Amino acid sequence: MKKIIGLVLSLTIIAGVCAAVLAYVDSITRDPIAQMKVKQEQAAVKAVLPADVTEVVPADGFYVGMDKADKILGYAAKGTDANGYGGDIVLMVGFKQDKKTIVCYRTLVAAETPGLGMKLKTPEFADQFGGKDGTSLAVTKDGGKIEAITSATITSRAVCRAIADAQKKIK
């Protein structure tokens, strides 16, 4: 009986120390991680807006890109689709003044298969979205004009849905 009590006590102490270490590491890394995510999002916003944007103004769930004369040149919004092959796909998508025509997108979050689904980050895949209407995207297998990533149709469809989600936010 004493042996069992000793084992339980030892395990409790070890678990308590581990919990304290994890809590400490979380407390010192939480702010830097949050700051990094903000910087990543800000960089993505600048990357997806038209090149002549000089000022970015946050709006209600999206960003407005303007020139020096305060003329609106484009919009950026975050779009999400939970049905990627590896889970959530989160994109920052840029649109022209008409709020429909895609400038480009940048991937914020994706856990797709390396070498297949992660090709959503490559220019070969991403560039085909530029100039297209964000309200009517579909892969060729579904009657659309987007060439799906070979062996990663689920990911390609999720990108189309994430872009549509972003487009809805700027209406």
Residue ranges and their predicted role:
Residues 2-171:
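Flexible, solvent-exposed loop/hinge segments and secondary-structure transition points
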